[in-house]
Amino acid sequence: MFAVVFFILSLMTCQPGVTAQEKVNQRVRRAATPAAVTCQLSNWSEWTDCFPCQDKKYRHRSLLQPNKFGGTICSGDIWDQASCSSSTTCVRQAQCGQDFQCKETGRCLKRHLVCNGDQDCLDGSDEDDCEDVRAIDEDCSQYEPIPGSQKAALGYNILTQEDAQSVYDASYYGGQCETVYNGEWRELRYDSTCERLYYGDDEKYFRKPYNFLKYHFEALADTGISSEFYDNANDLLSKVKKDKSDSFGVTIGIGPAGSPLLVGVGVSHSQDTSFLNELNKYNEKKFIFTRIFTKVQTAHFKMRKDDIMLDEGMLQSLMELPDQYNYGMYAKFINDYGTHYITSGSMGGIYEYILVIDKAKMESLGITSRDITTCFGGSLGIQYEDKINVGGGLSGDHCKKFGGGKTERARKAMAVEDIISRVRGGSSGWSGGLAQNRSTITYRSWGRSLKYNPVVIDFEMQPIHEVLRHTSLGPLEAKRQNLRRALDQYLMEFNACRCGPCFNNGVPILEGTSCRCQCRLGSLGAACEQTQTEGAKADGSWSCWSSWSVCRAGIQERRRECDNPAPQNGGASCPGRKVQTQAC
């Protein structure tokens, strides 16, 4: 087979019209492509009992083997549900004694919260049939909730890096009327109907929900626009991954920048999948990349540590979990409410765009990537952190001539093949506009809209089972231990360590139930096994953790090996520990 390939390539070199890409391919050192691996799912589990509060039953199947190296993909989902009827009464929380119990979910409330004007039950039953409403001392109906409170209340899936359903109840106030002062309320507004200027008194104070211990508005300020330059897509991906890991304080399942990238696993695809697919189009060509990035903070917050009031939907799902371990039911709970919950963080927004630059064309124009970056970023009207100045072959006048790269024709004239934008936070109108129109007005308008439409941009978090320690629901230790055990199993089932090996410093990526290797420039093939550079250093990558050993003397351990693949030609060994222990 190899002789035939070599003969064909030899004939091609003697023919006219051979492309540059074909010449590159001729210099590629061929290696055996690993055999394709077909995706395998387990058989469906038995249906769960009918959930009486939902009138639904569930079943699941496990990912036995993700497909690799072009193998057949799996079809269908790993979760299934069906309607059902249960003869069992809807499960309630333990009896509330002298306290009030919400009709639908069984939440317990202190009597002073009944008929106080606040709806503390999701079904409003605490405010039904009230002859005398004991209103809170101060009229709180005039205050809007603090911006972003619903976002901070959500669970978080550390594998998909996506939000899950609510863990905290962001609409519960505990009978209190605590407000947060907004220092920028004095900003003048214009009422076009009445043709008058006025102060935004309605935005002077915001009401703080019970589960928020602290919330402090920040004067609108960005971190400055930074620019970074990359010679290949892999280095850029590693940096983006590291930034995402740095945004949260617990990194279970993520690992250092050199470990496998986790994207879109379980039942959904990460929002980053489209970004990776766009970037992957430029991986095998001679492109370089400039990443322009800014982060805007609008507020800091800290959540309550003890006596947490859970969202009523989560409370109901929690009460329906059996005390006996059932991975399917507990994994479904994790899939719905996240692997982790947020304990503190910052609100605001993030804006970044990546310039894909044709290196050969840029050099023929006599300009640099810094010149191009300055020309594009200057349209935002913000200073760069590294004080880039327009220079080289691209003068300020030349930049203006092409309109700052605002049209496709102008971009092509400055060697910019594509622009990949990502915007988080802000009103939908301004964030969408910023992705398409990089102007000073659009950027500043987006920044102002972040004050009242922020997302969580930096945060600390804890594993989801820890929240059960900090509620007032009573003894839940059996469920907490089951949830902890299921979380370990869930994180291993959907980990990119199951992909690979990806050779020549390729990066394994797990998308849904499919694995692929992101190859560096100069490498290609399903496993990046073909390379143009003979004897180049290739770093090692970890295998998955083994199962936990039997408990001995209160300690158990698990291991992993640096063989997925092993280092080659003097490449670096895997970072981190080979053995992990825990109390048992």
UniProtKB/Swiss-Prot annotation:
Chain segments annotated as transmembrane: 248-256, 259-266, 377-384, 390-395
Residues under site feature: Not glycosylated = N43
Residues annotated as domain MACPF: 135-498
Q: Binding of Ca(2+): at which residues?
A: L113, N116, D118, D120, D126, E127
Read off the SUPFAM superfamilies from this record. Growth factor receptor domain (SSF57184), TSP-1 type 1 repeat (SSF82895)
Pfam families for the chain: EGF_C8A_B_C6, Ldl_recept_a, MACPF, TSP_1
GO-annotated molecular function = complement binding; protein-containing complex binding
Cleavable signal peptide = 1-20
Q: What is its main location?
A: secreted
Provide the residue ranges of the propeptide in this protein: 21-30
For this UniProt record, the keywords arranged alphabetically read as follows: Cleavage on pair of basic residues, Complement alternate pathway, Complement pathway, Cytolysis, Disease variant, Disulfide bond, EGF-like domain, Glycoprotein, Immunity, Innate immunity, Membrane, Membrane attack complex, Repeat, Secreted, Signal, Target cell membrane, Target membrane, Transmembrane, Transmembrane beta strand
> What are the start and end residues of every segment in region (Disordered)?
562-584
| Disulfide bond residue pairs | C39-C74, C50-C84, C53-C90, C96-C108, C102-C121, C115-C130, C140-C177, C375-C399, C497-C544, C499-C515, C502-C517, C519-C528, C551-C584, C562-C574
Domain EGF-like intervals: 499-529
Q: Where is the LDL-receptor class A domain?
A: 94-132
Q: Where in the cell is it found?
A: Secreted; Target cell membrane
Q: What function does the entry list?
A: Component of the membrane attack complex (MAC), a multiprotein complex activated by the complement cascade, which inserts into a target cell membrane and forms a pore, leading to target cell membrane rupture and cell lysis. The MAC is initiated by proteolytic cleavage of C5 into complement C5b in response to the classical, alternative, lectin and GZMK complement pathways. The complement pathways consist in a cascade of proteins that leads to phagocytosis and breakdown of pathogens and signaling that strengthens the adaptive immune system.
* Record disease entry: Complement component 8 deficiency, 1: A rare defect of the complement classical pathway associated with susceptibility to severe recurrent infections, predominantly by Neisseria gonorrhoeae or Neisseria meningitidis.
Q: How does it assemble?
A: Heterotrimer of 3 chains: alpha (C8A), beta (C8B) and gamma (C8G); the alpha and gamma chains are disulfide bonded. Component of the membrane attack complex (MAC), composed of complement C5b, C6, C7, C8A, C8B, C8G and multiple copies of the pore-forming subunit C9.
Give the similarity note.
Answer: Belongs to the complement C6/C7/C8/C9 family.
What's the protein here called?
Complement component C8 alpha chain
- Species of origin reads Homo sapiens
